[in-house]
Amino acid sequence: MNHFPKLLSSQIGFDVAQTILENFDRHYRIFREAAVEAKDLFERSDWHGLQRLARERITSYDDRVRECVELLEDEYDAENIDHDVWPQIKLHYIGLLTSHRQPECAETFFNSVCCKILHRAYFNNDFIFVRPAISTEYIENDEPAAKPTYRAYYPGSEGLAATLERIVTNFQLNPPFEDLERDIACIMQAIHDEFGAFDEAVNFQIHVLSSLFYRNKTAYIVGRIINGDRVLPFAVPIRHARAGVLALDTVLLRRDQLKIIFSFSHSYFLVDMNVPSAYVQFLRSIMPGKPKAEIYTSVGLQKQGKNLFYRDLLHHLSHSSDRFIIAPGIKGLVMLVFTLPSFPYVFKMIKDHFPPPKETTREQIMDKYLLVKRHDRLGRMADTLEYSSVALPLARLDDALVRELEKEVPSLIEYEGDSLVIKHLYIERRMVPLNLYLQNGSDAEIEHGVREYGNAVKELIQANIFPGDMLYKNFGVTRHGRVVFYDYDEIEYLTDCNVRRVPPPRNDEDEMSGEPWYTVGPHDIFPETYAPFLLGDPRVREHFLAHHADFFDPQLWQDSKDRLLRGELPDFFAYEPALRFCLRYPERFAPGDAAEDGKRAAA
């Protein structure tokens, strides 16, 4: 039944709606300005500036919501607005969005503001946008001189090489390319290596998104090749070959490669989008299995992604019948973890009490999760979605899970009719725990898992992240075979840690003792002591020492810390370094150009 009023008679309803939209427009203007600034920082190789910009943008949304709520309280006494007026506010807001270019994001902003003002009882479609009201189909920016969402190129008229060069130069990056002709030739060879010779159909064309995707030290060109009935995705990473010159680093031509660079374990891109829904639609056309929620999140619109994810969860619950259960595996000391087997995510709650030896607090753990959210995740740390006041149907909760919730997190649950309301939780992608992957894997899988684990930890410490508890159970294996860290309660900055060698035992008694014979400070780490916990399985030990014999050498850890203290930021690649042109086609690189730099970076 529709409870909306037939007449919009409230002036305050229109004023509140307009105020909320004005505040959203301010938020989105700041969001786009960050992407424009990213281009300048990339061109100047200001990597610390890019990191700062990415961190600040993550908290910008909540800042704008808070400002809007404060303004509504000051101007309209929002908490005391008559509840009959709120449906009118929503209708006025819908009217204001009919020609808007980011309506779905504006609806989410409206929800964020209203949920700070209204009681949970009003979180329904009469008052907030439980479902979208404005279609995002076929929105395009038709303002004069505006960039289209994507540009179409037709190689048939000028040849593929010339078209590829025009695609690159149209982005008007300021530093010159070291050798653009060489890089285009590498792309041509890579296309031939991947697809062989293919006949050009009458509709042969290339579509390229009009904005670059910035992250870390890389800017990505993203597009698709249309040939007959085939749609071939591609991404071209642009990097600084050396100071003052650019190079096309490789071309990614497989969907699984693109899915990895847009994965939940990477930090969000900085990309300028006037019509975000059009970008998301384009990206879904080249990664059709990827949920819209994940794509919105990966392009920096994490609140929209979070909103869509929750709608996906509710939709799944209405079309499934299995029950939430305690997550299989080793139970954690700090987090209670449960899952819905038919839904590929886990739900994590901070326990009310932690047994020894854990010495932490709920606030400290939440700070750790926020640290990860704001840090460069490098494809090695799982992103988390944080929710409050989540109502789950009691009938869908396994009895053992309910007992566990009542035992471990009584302060975070509340019964409300037929629902259990969870006051705070985190949601992450479900992965195969690395300890189970190694325990049940073939020899080849064990070697892959061990190599990936060592690479993951080494990349994390290079990025100033010390995982703390490095047992295999705290890492997971993604659908694409990447090893990702997901247990953050003991995480620290490496620069805050003291890397130490184990002092030699003073006597036989020390050597036989099961306890340290040396003092251990709160931030001391001893890499030599990790071996007994990681190398117990002979099969794991063999592969670990073959690929990462230096892992237990304190010098490896100290060298990373020293580089960080000097302000150095290492190179990270969201794709296999072996795909880089300088390594894949070394014969095309003359001595003294980027080839040598590339070999060193990939070493």
UniProtKB/Swiss-Prot annotation:
Natural source organism: Burkholderia thailandensis (strain ATCC 700388 / DSM 13276 / CCUG 48851 / CIP 106301 / E264)
Family from the record: Belongs to the AceK family.
InterPro entries associated with the record: AceK_kinase, AceK_regulatory, Isocitrate_DH_AceK
GO CC annotation: cytoplasm
Protein name: Isocitrate dehydrogenase kinase/phosphatase
GO process terms (BP): glucose metabolic process; glyoxylate cycle; tricarboxylic acid cycle
Active site: 383
Enzyme Commission numbers on file: 2.7.11.5, 3.1.3.-
Function: Bifunctional enzyme which can phosphorylate or dephosphorylate isocitrate dehydrogenase (IDH) on a specific serine residue. This is a regulatory mechanism which enables bacteria to bypass the Krebs cycle via the glyoxylate shunt in response to the source of carbon. When bacteria are grown on glucose, IDH is fully active and unphosphorylated, but when grown on acetate or ethanol, the activity of IDH declines drastically concomitant with its phosphorylation.
Subcellular localization, as worded in the UniProt entry: Cytoplasm
Catalysed reaction, written as an equation: L-seryl-[isocitrate dehydrogenase] + ATP = O-phospho-L-seryl-[isocitrate dehydrogenase] + ADP + H(+)
GO molecular function: [isocitrate dehydrogenase (NADP+)] kinase activity; AMP binding; ATP binding; phosphoprotein phosphatase activity; protein serine/threonine kinase activity
Keywords annotated in UniProt: ATP-binding, Cytoplasm, Glyoxylate bypass, Hydrolase, Kinase, Nucleotide-binding, Protein phosphatase, Serine/threonine-protein kinase, Transferase, Tricarboxylic acid cycle
Keyword Cytoplasm listed: yes
Residue sites binding ATP per the record: 327-333, 348
NCBIfam families, sorted: PRK02946.1
